[in-house]
């Protein structure tokens, strides 16, 4: 129950370095519930292996999280999360810089 709305990002994406990996966190809102796809470059990522994908839902507000474990230099670069529902879609871009 709520007004239909296309995906809208609520804040800048946050990248947090963990002990052995990184966490990407994106806050957004939309209604109805979206389809969520994470990408590295143009390649869609799937859950499993070193990738853990989670979301928390509070009404129409979503926190989208992806964690990458055992990060190596090859993991650096551009990522995005695509969020799509029947009202539209949005993308949030994240850049993972791995310095020494």
Report the location of each language-model feature.
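Immunoglobulin-superfamily
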Residues: 1-100
């Amino acid at each position: 129950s709520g007004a239909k709305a296309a995906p809208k990002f609520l804040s800048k994406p946050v990248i947090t370095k963990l002990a052995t990996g990184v966490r990407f966190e994106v806050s957004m809102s939309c209604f109805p519930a979206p389809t969520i796809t994470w990408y590295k470059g143009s390649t869609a990522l799937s859950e499993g292996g070193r990738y853990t994908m989670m979301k928390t839902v509070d009404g129409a507000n979503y926190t989208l999280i992806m964690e990458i474990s055992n990060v190596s230099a090859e993991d650096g670069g551009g990522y995005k999360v695509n969020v799509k529902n029947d009202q539209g879609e949005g993308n949030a871009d994240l850049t993972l810089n791995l310095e020494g």
